[in-house]
Amino acid sequence: MFLYVAVGSLVVARLLLYPLRPADLTPPYWVAMGATAITVLAGAHIVEMADAPMAIVTSGLVAGASVVFWAFGPWLIPPLVAASIWKHVVHRVPLRYEATLWSVVFPLGMYGVGAYRLGLAAHLPIVESIGEFEGWVALAVWTITFVAMLHHLAATIGRSGRSSHAIGAADDTHAIICRPPRSFDHQVRAFRRNQPM
C-alpha cells in the first residue's frame, strides 16, 4: 500500500508539474488500475480462507480494504479513457499498435477477475455481476489488441520482404555490405582495452 501511494504521488506530481504532451500519455498509465485490481483479488482470496486462524481474525478488515480498493479502480477508468480520447481524438495522434497496449488489457482483465472473486467472497451479487461484465470487456480489448498485433506483424513482415527484394534487385555497384555482429568475447576484449589502468 505504501509503495502504491508513493508511486502514485510521483505520477501525479509529474502530471501536475510538467507540461503534458499527447505523446506522454502512454498505455502503461493503466497499470495503476491493475495494481488496485490485484489487491482486490488478493483480499478476496484471504477472505475465502475459512480454515486459517489469521484469516478469520482479519477477514473483516481485509474485506473492507478490498472493497475500498475495488471502488478506487473504477474511479480511475474515466480519467484514463478521457486521456485516451484527448490524445487520439482531440490531438489526432493516430492509434497504432504498440507492445505497450497490452498494459491496458491486463488491468481490465484483473479488475474483472478481482471484482468477480470479491463478489463471491463478500456475498455481493452486484460486484460479482460487474466483474462478469468487466471480464467480457477485457476479452473484447484483448481480441482487438491481438488482431492489431497480427496486423502489425503482417505489415512488418511484408515491408521487410519488399525491402529485401529491392536490395536483391539492385545492381552490384550499390550493393549493401552487411557485417556480422561482433561476438560477445570480442566486445569484452574491446571494452577492457579501453579501460584506464
UniProtKB/Swiss-Prot annotation:
Record GO cellular component, one term: plasma membrane
Compartmental location: Cell membrane
Keyword Cell membrane tagged: yes
Chain segments annotated as transmembrane: 30-50, 61-81, 101-121, 130-150
BP GO annotations: transmembrane transport
Use in biotech settings: This protein serves as an immunogenic antigen, inducing gamma-interferon responses in whole-blood cultures from M.tuberculosis-exposed adults in Uganda, The Gambia and South Africa, indicating this might be a good vaccine candidate.
Gene3D superfamilies xrefs: Voltage-dependent anion channel
Listed InterPro entries: SLAC1/Mae1/Ssu1/TehA (IPR004695), Voltage-dep_anion_channel_sf (IPR038665)
Source species, domain of life: Bacteria
Membrane topology: Multi-pass membrane protein
Assigned keywords, A-Z: Cell membrane, Membrane, Transmembrane, Transmembrane helix
Induction of its expression: A member of the dormancy regulon. Induced in response to reduced oxygen tension (hypoxia), low levels of nitric oxide (NO) and carbon monoxide (CO). It is hoped that this regulon will give insight into the latent, or dormant phase of infection.
Keyword 4Fe-4S: no
Annotated organism of origin: Mycobacterium tuberculosis (strain ATCC 25618 / H37Rv)
Protein name in UniProt: Uncharacterized membrane protein Rv1735c
